[in-house]
């Protein structure tokens, strides 16, 4: 039934009769009486309100508290509920997911369906929510016109009654369901009742990697339209080849009763007018009668018309400069009186694939994208405007220009905000059948064709007026079948202005204009059966392949991950047809739960008693659930930044800056530079940045490098900031940065022996603070007995155990400084990437954690092989050898040489040999538990945020200071975290460590991180745990289910050496 037809008289079926049909188990029944899809309507009754986007009096929200009753299956619902509320009904907010209000449980699964796989059947025990609400209408709404109800999102299927009469049925959780209520309304109070089913045959098409929840989770509203009204509006822009002029094409359809469609006296009495505004300036206007040119031998459309307005020198829309016009479409009667008006933001932009490149307005675009689920930790899938805007601002601030709506059409407001703030959008149909075997089983089944097709066609019909949408997607992980080919052709016919992408079937079928693989690697082929994933460099060079490649998913950001991300961006900038991709994904999909004491925590799969579940696999975000950043977000920001830097010379000091902006000039950018010596500023300056799009410019910063006043590393830091605030960023927002280590001019030390020694022995630079005339005092004392070796200097005493060979205690003024002795450390608390798909019921022998377990890395037995003491003239030296074995097989050999000097320093040289049979260890380092707890940590090295050997592009060498608690990254699933690399000096309380090392420091031991399932369960331990690594394996991140650490970041050598110098300032 079309929206042009009045609801006919129908025999009212009882609730049991309706339910007995089991429409929710018939894929060929997706709706009853649902109106056709169209762009959002407001039905303004004056042009100015439409042009200024004022709230429309013709809309009435039904959001708020509804009456709610919960049942375990639809057949349990009493028949009289359709007419009156049940006694046990409770209030429930709309929009909301009922699982977050004490009914039923949310379920998190990735691939596995949460119900037995028997399509189209679903379980008889099918949780059912019964909603109802009373409302009253303006008397004018009842006097004339049509009143419709709009549900923007209901999961997964629902029936609707109004005043006890059945209205209709709908499924597809992520697109609006709209019904004409006019025949059912009455004066005074009206009651609507909605029966929502958790599972339907549509659930087999909604197998996305997300929390499975139910209810009316998007807005509900009433809309009043005139009897004769605008039924559909399609807006397109066409730019001239030189982009100097454009045509605005508007196709508008009018609702006219079917019996009058062929009456020219009726149809010819209506006119359509389009006005195009730029702010308050009317740019163009056109008015013409209803009707089109003849379409075929039967004639024209009499209920629609096409209007084309020519615009000279249009301001173009892009994510960089999202200039929007406003098109007001008015329906006029024969007296030229306004019947109603609709209005839409219009962006003049062209999307095309030309010569193998995706181009926006003629420019090849580099997609700086991210996948985003609609998720909020408290409200689940019910998202408000504040949350939508928060995500957009964060994305823009961190150099994202694109977002993929994974994996369903989003809330209508999302697209309006992306239009206005500037983000390119891949709009994706609500289709995923990942749990089917094969995935294409349903897409090749004709009985499912209508269910598939409505999810694609209705998405396009709702969203096609948005300039932000540059690509349509047929869905996600649903294989490749005949249905996909048909829907690809439908889109290309109905919207030739946008390309279509679809990853299923290998990312390179005829149903996609873009090669859009997921998790293809930069240089490594993955020759999977049927659907091989070639390296992205290889893929674009395959014979007869000319399409651009944009990764629909890459860089799986699960927990402490994102290693090797910079490699992708090196490739993107090197190979033109590698045009970026969409990171997986934006936000950790954790929900707020409460423990037995009512305290909140972030939960993941299984925490609600949900089965089946995929545990913490829902947490792959660049941001935590509350949108605070993961360290990986900074890595993405830096890799994707729009300015690239190169150092041309040091005398004079000249750099080159290239703008990767395609359309905007750098009219709000200031270049700041600073020459740093060991973290201290030696010379600095700033100047405006004046760069045209896609241009480069040299900047002369200084005539020569500054004269050094002490030895150390010299660095040049540059950054670009925006002096003025923008719609998406505050003033002084940092948008780009870079750093180079400079050649060091010869430092001429004084004749003082201490300075000279420091110059030629950089590892002793921590001693430069000693006054020049300070005299060495007191000799070192050595004491030995059968159990201990003690080295004493002034108030300090180092005590070794002869049994273990370890430094068992460090005394200062008779106070013990160590709670656990200093010892080797070769393991880390496993990362999600280390674990991969390995779990208790499914062991993956290729996972790093399983290889380490099998080798005995977590159960190493240590033996002291030898212990030697030498009392030299100015120092004491203790040499110890340690052997590590598992099941009597030697695996590691560690040789430590401790040197104690008359400055109270302990220098340790460590040499580690690794058996060739042992898998590469996670780290080569040492750890101990310090008795002290200091409020701050101060270091000279890479920072300020967490960084790892394969994730340090965004980190900078400098002098940093942070509170102790900020040295721990609170990943929801605890793991190794908090490392800072390439450190030369660490100060913690009275402790000073120097050398060249990585370190991590926190209140939690590696052992506690290994055995604790959730962040909130971690208990601060006594003292402080200090991890010092000479070497640390990368974290990986190409994906999280197979080993993805690149070979350069794996500890594959047989021997490793490092040196650390410790001192306690008494």
Curated annotation (Swiss-Prot):
Keywords: Glycosidase, Hydrolase, Magnesium, Metal-binding, Sodium. It catalyses: Hydrolysis of terminal non-reducing beta-D-galactose residues in beta-D-galactosides. Substrate binds at residues 110, 209, 477, 553-556, 620, 1041. Its cofactor is Mg(2+); Na(+). Belongs to the glycosyl hydrolase 2 family. GO terms for biological process: lactose catabolic process. Na(+) binds at residues 209, 617, 620. The lineage of its organism: Bacteria, Pseudomonadati, Pseudomonadota, Gammaproteobacteria, Enterobacterales. GO terms for cellular component: beta-galactosidase complex. This is Beta-galactosidase. Pfam families: Bgal_small_N, Glyco_hydro_2, Glyco_hydro_2_C, Glyco_hydro_2_N, LacZ_4. It comes from Yersinia pseudotuberculosis serotype O:1b (strain IP 31758). Binds 2 magnesium ions per monomer. Mg(2+) 2 binds at residue 613. Mg(2+) 1 binds at residues 432, 434, 477. The keyword Hydrolase applies.
């Amino acid at each position: 039934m079309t929206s042009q037809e009045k609801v006919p008289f129908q025999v009212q079926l009882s609730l049991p009769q309706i339910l007995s049909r089991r429409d929710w188990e018939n894929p060929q029944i997706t709706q009853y009486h649902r109106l056709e899809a169209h762009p959002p309507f407001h039905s303004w009754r004056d042009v100015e309100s439409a042009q200024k986007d004022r709230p429309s009096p013709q809309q009435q929200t039904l959001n708020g508290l509804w009456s709610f009753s919960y049942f375990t299956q639809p057949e349990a619902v009493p028949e009289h509920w359709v007419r009156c509320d049940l006694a046990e009904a409770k209030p429930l907010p709309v929009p909301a997911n009922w699982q977050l209000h004490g009914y039923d449980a949310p379920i998190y699964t990735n691939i596995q369906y949460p119900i037995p796989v028997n399509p189209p059947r679903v379980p008889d025990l099918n949780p059912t929510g019964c909603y109802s609400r009373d409302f009253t209408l303006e008397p004018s709404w009842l006097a004339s016109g049509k009143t419709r109800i709009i549900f923007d999102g209901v999961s997964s299927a629902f029936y609707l009654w109004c005043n006890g009469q059945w209205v209709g049925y709908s499924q597809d959780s992520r697109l609006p369901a709209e019904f004409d209520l006019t025949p059912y309304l009455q004066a005074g109070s009206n009651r609507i009742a909605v029966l929502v089913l958790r599972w339907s045959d549509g659930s087999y098409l909604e197998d996305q990697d997300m929390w499975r929840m139910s209810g009316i989770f998007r807005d509900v509203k009433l809309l009043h339209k005139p009897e004769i009204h605008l039924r559909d509006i399609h807006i397109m822009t066409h730019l001239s080849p030189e982009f100097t002029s454009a045509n605005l094409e508007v196709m508008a359809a009018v609702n006219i009763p079917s019996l009058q469609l062929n009456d020219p006296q009726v149809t010819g009495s209506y006119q359509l007018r389009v006005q195009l505004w730029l702010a308050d300036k009317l740019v163009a206007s056109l008015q013409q009668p209803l009707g089109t040119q003849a379409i075929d031998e039967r004639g024209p459309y009499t209920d629609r018309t096409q209007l084309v307005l020519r615009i000279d020198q249009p301001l173009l829309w892009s994510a960089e400069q999202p200039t929007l016009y406003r098109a007001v479409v008015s329906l006029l009667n024969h007296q030229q009186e306004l019947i109603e008006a609709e209005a839409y933001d219009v962006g003049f932009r062209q999307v095309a694939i030309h010569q193998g490149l995706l181009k926006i307005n003629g420019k090849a675009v580099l997609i700086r994208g991210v996948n985003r689920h609609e998720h909020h930790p408290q409200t689940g899938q019910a998202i408000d405007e504040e949350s939508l805007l928060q995500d957009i601002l964060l994305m823009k601030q961190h150099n994202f220009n694109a977002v993929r709506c994974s994996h369903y059409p989003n809330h209508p407001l999302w697209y309006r905000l992306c239009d206005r703030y500037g983000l390119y959008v891949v709009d994706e149909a609500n289709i995923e059948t990942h749990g089917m075997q094969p995935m294409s089983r349903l897409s090749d089944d004709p009985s499912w064709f209508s269910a598939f097709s409505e999810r694609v066609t209705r998405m396009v019909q709702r969203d096609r007026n948005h300039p932000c949408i540059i690509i349509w997607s047929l869905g996600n992980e649903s294989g490749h079948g005949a249905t996909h080919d048909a829907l690809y052709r439908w889109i290309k016919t109905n919207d030739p202005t946008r390309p279509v992408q679809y990853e299923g079937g290998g990312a390179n079928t005829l149903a996609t204009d873009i090669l859009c693989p997921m998790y293809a690697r930069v240089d490594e082929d993955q020759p999977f059966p049927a659907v091989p994933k070639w390296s992205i460099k290889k893929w674009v060079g395959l014979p007869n392949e000319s399409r651009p490649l944009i990764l629909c998913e890459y860089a799986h950001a699960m927990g402490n991950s994102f290693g090797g991300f910079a490699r992708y961006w090196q490739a993107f900038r090197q190979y033109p047809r590698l045009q970026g991709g969409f990171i997986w994904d934006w936000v950790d999909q954790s929900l707020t739960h409460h423990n037995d004491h009512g305290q909140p925590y972030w939960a993941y799969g299984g925490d609600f008693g949900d089965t089946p579940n995929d545990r913490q696999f829902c947490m792959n975000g660049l941001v935590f659930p509350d949108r605070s950043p993961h360290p990986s977000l900074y890595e993405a920001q830096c890799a994707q930044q729009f300015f690239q830097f190169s150092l041309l010379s040091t005398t004079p000091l000249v750099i080159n800056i290239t703008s990767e902006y395609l359309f905007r000039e750098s009219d709000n950018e200031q270049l700041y530079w600073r020459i740093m010596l060991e973290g201290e500023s030696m010379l600095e300056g700033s100047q405006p940045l004046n760069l045209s799009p896609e241009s480069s410019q040299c900047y002369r910063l200084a005539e020569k490098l500054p004269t050094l006043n002490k030895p150390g590393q010299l660095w040049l830091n540059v950054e670009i900031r925006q002096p003025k605030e923008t719609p998406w960023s505050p003033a002084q927002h940092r948008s780009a940065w870079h750093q180079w280590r400079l050649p060091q001019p010869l430092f001429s030390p004084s004749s003082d022996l201490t300075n000279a020694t420091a110059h030629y022995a950089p590892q002793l630079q921590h001693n430069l603070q000693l006054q020049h005339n300070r005299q060495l005092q007191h000799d070192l004392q050595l004491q030995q007995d059968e159990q201990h070796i003690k080295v004493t200097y002034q108030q300090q005493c180092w005590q070794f155990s002869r049994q273990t060979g370890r430094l068992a205690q460090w005394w200062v003024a008779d106070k013990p400084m160590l709670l656990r002795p200093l010892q080797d450390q070769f393991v880390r608390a496993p990362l999600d990437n280390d674990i991969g798909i390995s779990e208790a019921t499914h062991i993956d022998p290729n996972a790093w954690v399983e290889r380490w377990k099998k080798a005995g890395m977590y159960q190493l037995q240590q033996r002291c092989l030898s212990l030697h003491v030498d009392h030299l003239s100015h120092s004491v030296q203790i040499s110890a050898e340690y052997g590590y074995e598992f099941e009597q097989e030697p695996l590691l050999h560690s040789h430590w040489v401790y040197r104690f000097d008359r400055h109270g320093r302990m220098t340790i040289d460590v040499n580690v040999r690794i058996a060739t049979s042992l898998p590469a260890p996670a780290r080569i380092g040492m750890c101990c538990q310090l008795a002290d707890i200091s409020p701050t940590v101060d270091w000279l090295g890479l920072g300020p945020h967490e960084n790892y050997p394969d994730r340090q592009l965004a980190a900078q060498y400098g002098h940093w200071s942070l509170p102790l608690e900020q040295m721990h990254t609170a990943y929801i699933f605890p793991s190794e975290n908090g490392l800072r690399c390439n450190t030369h000096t660490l100060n913690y309380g009275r402790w000073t460590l120097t050398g060249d090392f990585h370190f991590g420091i926190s209140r939690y031991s590696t052992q506690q991180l290994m055995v604790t399932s959730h962040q909130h369960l971690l208990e601060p331990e006594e003292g402080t745990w200090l991890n010092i690594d000479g070497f640390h394996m990368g974290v990986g991140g190409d994906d999280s289910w197979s080993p993805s650490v690149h070979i350069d970041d794996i500890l594959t050598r047989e021997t490793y050496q490092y040196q650390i110098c410790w001192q306690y300032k008494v």
